[in-house]
């Protein structure tokens, strides 16, 4: 018992990004601008992920679906398999390079799943936005270290065997869980980027 189409997602995504400037891969710009662009990208991706999650919940997660969730397997977020900090105190204990590499790993872990979920992001450029942020983080790593762009190795393929079937309650709940993971991970990336920027550029209004 699946409600109508996902047309509302297209409009939502377009509105979310219509005012975000496209700076591509952050070519030859000062460090402050690299940080500002990366933080803005992460902020908008987190906002987008939260809006899509809420819209999906309103559209698909009915009371009947919620009742059936008691017997459904909960989706495990891939990010639980990497030692990325999950709270403010632990985040501040990590080095800049640790936070950048955690961010890079989280972004890269969503490149394939976002393509599989593309029909939920109709007329959007979520994948391209992830790629832009990936390039921005790589540029920061090059600037702050020796050009080594390694991220943390995937202990397993992120969200392998991803089968999207929205014709069943279990399928609807699986997508719901994935969108929740996407939202949480984009929040982490946004937080990490803000922490690093604040370390380099003491800003009076910078609150983490």
From Swiss-Prot:
Keyword flag Phosphoprotein: no
Coiled-coil features, chain-numbered ranges: none
Cysteine-cysteine disulfides: 77-181, 198-206
General function of this protein: Growth hormone plays an important role in growth control.
Keyword annotations from UniProtKB, A to Z: Disulfide bond, Hormone, Metal-binding, Secreted, Signal, Zinc
Record's GO cellular component terms: extracellular space
Signal peptide span: 1-25
Name of the molecule in the record: Somatotropin-B
Gene Ontology terms for molecular function: growth factor activity; growth hormone receptor binding; hormone activity; metal ion binding
Domain of life: Eukaryota
InterPro entries according to UniProt: 4_helix_cytokine-like_core (IPR009079), Somatotropin (IPR034975), Somatotropin/Prolactin (IPR001400), Somatotropin_CS (IPR018116)
């Amino acid at each position: 018992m699946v409600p109508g189409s996902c047309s509302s997602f297209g409009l939502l995504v377009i509105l979310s990004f219509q005012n975000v400037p496209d700076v591509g891969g952050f070519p030859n710009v000062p460090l402050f601008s690299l940080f500002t662009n990366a933080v803005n990208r992460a902020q908008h991706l987190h906002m987008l992920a939260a809006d899509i999650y809420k819209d999906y919940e309103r559209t698909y997660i009915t009371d009947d679906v919620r009742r059936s969730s008691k017997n459904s397997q909960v989706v495990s977020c891939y990010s639980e398999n990497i030692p990325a900090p999950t709270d403010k105190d632990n985040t501040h204990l990590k080095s800049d390079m640790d936070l950048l590499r955690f961010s890079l790993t989280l972004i890269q872990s969503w490149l394939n799943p976002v393509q599989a979920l593309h029909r939920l992001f109709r007329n959007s450029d979520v994948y391209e936005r992830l790629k832009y942020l990936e390039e921005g983080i790589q540029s920061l790593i090059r600037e702050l270290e020796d050009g080594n762009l390694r991220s943390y190795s995937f202990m397993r393929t992120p969200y392998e065997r991803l089968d999207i079937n929205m014709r069943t309650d279990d399928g609807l709940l699986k997508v719901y869980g994935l969108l929740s993971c996407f939202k949480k991970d984009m929040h982490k990336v946004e937080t990490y980027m803000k922490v690093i920027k604040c370390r380099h550029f003491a800003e009076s209004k910078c609150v983490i």
